[in-house]
């Protein structure tokens, strides 16, 4: 019986996601056993700076990918939105389980909705994507950066001067906390989700054919296709955490992919948005990127990167 070593970050959410996925594999009843190896990433250690200032995408995966390449672990369970657009040579996303709710969750201290927040209220987020879109809707709000895992951020909302914070609904759902803490779900027309938000990425070595066959049992083809379109768009624009960028794709009734893609200025004064429909994930992602580039997306990205330096 083969033992599969599964890499995970140490946070409660990461371990919850990892153990959930292992349970899906165990339920297949195949001759494998599993062991979780906890790995500390750079993103877990650097908590006093915004993600965009310390390298953005890849902060939560590099050490785990190193463990995959050196065969310390066999696979890793990541949040898809943490994954860089390009993976190291020899590694691949071997499985995308069914996506859960991709929306952002708005959590306020006193139960006020986003529209009801007082003028000048303080909104906590560590995401340029969220801050740009929400400032576009409410330029009067003050954005204050907030870092840490889910429980840390919820504690900071209670104890510090934040009036509200934004978290991913998916993480709260996986922890079983969504019904207790969420004031409202932000509609994706107000705040387009991050590329891959709500989805998991199971990363493994390309040459591990045995493991890839096992992972195929849990793969969700709809999630795989829609997330692929989002990630192609992200790759074409070379966007990471350093720029307000968003992409969310769904499957239409006739099996076409509908991708809404967005690039914004840091302060939310400019939001470029396009929706593309097609059958090929790569073509849809590239078309969305090309349309936004024609609107001036590259210039916005350059400006955002300069502001971060």
Swiss-Prot record:
Co-factor note (free text): Binds 1 dipyrromethane group covalently.
Keywords noted in UniProt: Porphyrin biosynthesis, Transferase
Pfam families in the record: Porphobil_deam, Porphobil_deamC
Cofactor(s) essential for the protein: dipyrromethane
Source organism superkingdom: Bacteria
Summary of the function given for this chain in its UniProt record: Tetrapolymerization of the monopyrrole PBG into the hydroxymethylbilane pre-uroporphyrinogen in several discrete steps.
Entry protein name: Porphobilinogen deaminase
Organism: Bacillus cereus (strain ATCC 14579 / DSM 31 / CCUG 7414 / JCM 2152 / NBRC 15305 / NCIMB 9373 / NCTC 2599 / NRRL B-3711)
């Amino acid at each position: 019986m083969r033992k599969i070593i599964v890499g995970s970050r140490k946070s409660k959410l990461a371990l919850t996601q990892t153990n959930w996925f292992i349970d899906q594999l165990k339920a297949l009843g195949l001759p494998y056993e599993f062991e979780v190896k906890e790995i500390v990433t750079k993103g877990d250690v650097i908590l006093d700076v915004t993600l965009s200032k310390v390298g953005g995408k890849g902060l939560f995966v590099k050490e785990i990918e190193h463990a995959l390449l050196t065969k310390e672990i066999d696979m890793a369970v990541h949040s898809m939105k943490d994954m860089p657009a390009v993976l190291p040579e020899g590694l691949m996303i071997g499985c995308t389980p069914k996506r859960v709710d991709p929306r952002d969750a708005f959590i306020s201290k006193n139960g006020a909705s986003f529209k009801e927040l007082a003028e000048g209220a303080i909104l906590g987020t560590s995401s340029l994507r969220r801050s740009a879109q929400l400032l576009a809707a409410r330029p009067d709000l003050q954005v204050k950066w907030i870092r840490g895992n889910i429980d840390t951020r919820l504690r900071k909302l209670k104890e510090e001067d934040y009036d509200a914070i934004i978290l991913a609904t998916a993480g709260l759902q996986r922890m079983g906390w969504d019904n207790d803490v969420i004031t409202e779900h932000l509609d994706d027309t107000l705040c387009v989700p991050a590329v891959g938000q709500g989805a998991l990425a199971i990363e493994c070595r390309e040459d591990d054919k045995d493991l890839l066959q096992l992972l195929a049992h849990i793969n969700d083809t709809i999630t795989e296709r829609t997330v692929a379109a989002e990630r192609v768009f992200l790759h074409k624009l070379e966007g990471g955490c350093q720029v307000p960028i968003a992409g969310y794709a769904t499957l239409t009734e006739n099996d076409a992919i509908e991708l809404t893609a967005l690039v914004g200025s840091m302060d939310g004064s400019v939001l470029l948005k396009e929706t593309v429909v097609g059958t090929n994930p790569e073509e849809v992602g590239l078309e969305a990127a090309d349309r936004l580039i024609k609107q001036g997306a590259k210039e916005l990205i350059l400006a955002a990167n300069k502001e971060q330096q």
